[in-house]
Structure formats: C-alpha cells, structure tokens
C-alpha cells in the first residue's frame, strides 16, 4: 500500500479509496494512501444529479477518487465527495497513484538489495524522499537522470542513494525527444556533390555528445535534420549546431546555405 508522509489527508485533497460498505444514505471507503483510515461519502456527495439508487453510482470493492471535505482526527472521521471532482482531475489522480505504486515497488527492491524491509525503507528514507522530491517516484527519476550524487547532495545516505540509483537505472527509461529542422544547401563548384556529401556527414557528426543526429534528403537542395535526445533544450542546441556545421562547409566552397526550424505550411 502506497503511504503518505502524514497521518491524515488535508481538506481539499484528492484521495484514492476502496469502497467496502454501501448503505442507503452513503458509502464507506478505505483510504489507499492512509493506512487504517477511511472516508464517508454522503449520498448528497455521490453525484451532482438526483440519486435514486446509490448503488447505481457506487458499489463494494470499487476504486474511487474523492475530494476531502472535512477531517476530524479526534473522531477519526474523513468526509469526502465524489461529485466535486472534474474528470481530468480524477484521471490525473489515478495515474499518479499508479506511478506511486510502481515507485513503492522500486523502494522495496532497493530495500531488499540492502537486506531490509519495506517498512525499514519508509522509516529510513521513504518519507524523507517525499519531503525532498515531492513523491518517491520523483526521487527515482532524479537518480536515473543525475545519479546517486543527486540524492546524497540532498542528505540521503550513500547506502540508500546507491541502492535507489541501481534500481532506477534498471527500471526507468529516460523519455525521448525527437525534433527536426531543415537546411537548404547548394554549391556550383565542380566537386559540388562531394562538398554536399561532406556537409551532410558533418551535420551527423556530433562528436562525443549523446544526441543522435540523422540527415535525410527531402528533395535537393533541402535536407531534413532529425535529432533524438533525452532533453529538449539539448536537442535544440544539437539541431542548430548540426545545421551550422553543414552550412559552414557549403559556404566555404562558394555555396549557399540556410536553416529552417520549421517549414511554412
């Protein structure tokens, strides 16, 4: 069960629950992110329309997303609403919850690699990761992108930072960014074909940089340059640099070149 770094939800917060009891006047749900806590949804908060039969809207064992209306820790009560949520908010909450379920599994794997339990992981590092990165998955993403040092710089122990980074590298694939631009190049020197070939090879030669660059002929004198990267800003820089390398060679041979980020429609 995904856990939160606080005992009770806040008013206005979206929560995930599993309905375990439905009565004529409302429904009760166990909260997935707050162990041992439950919420009550009054029939008036089930739907914005008239509810003739509450079971037409909610049933036992159903996963639901609610908005917290009131919290009374002394009485152990959480009142919630099903109707005060937009569909996009409901979808986003469910997606985030599923991601955090995955993150908890990563945390458990990290703990096992150290001979520890999931409870140990939460107590020693899990709640701290939530405070620092917003959620556990955010910590694993950071580790996958920037390495263990990104965790130790925030005060996470080297032991946990290494374990988390190892699991992150095995399970999180960096997102790919694909962008394209165009170069128009031409030269009329006798060895012009060789010049163009050299220019296109220069565009694709990215040295030791990680960005992958490919050039395709759209129809002479126009060529498409495509860049694949894990970072949009780096991709843009690589695209411009590739175009500049290409144009520089053509212009050095008494030719002309220009870069177009996008084509006119």
Swiss-Prot record:
It comes from the Archaea. The keyword RNA-binding applies. Keywords: Initiation factor, Protein biosynthesis, RNA-binding. PROSITE patterns: S1 (PS50126). SMART domains: S1. SUPFAM superfamilies: eIF-2-alpha, C-terminal domain (SSF110993), eIF2alpha middle domain-like (SSF116742), Nucleic acid-binding proteins (SSF50249). GO terms for molecular function: ribosome binding; RNA binding; translation initiation factor activity. Pfam families: EIF_2_alpha, S1. Belongs to the eIF-2-alpha family. eIF-2 functions in the early steps of protein synthesis by forming a ternary complex with GTP and initiator tRNA. Heterotrimer composed of an alpha, a beta and a gamma chain. This is Translation initiation factor 2 subunit alpha. It comes from Methanobrevibacter smithii (strain ATCC 35061 / DSM 861 / OCM 144 / PS).
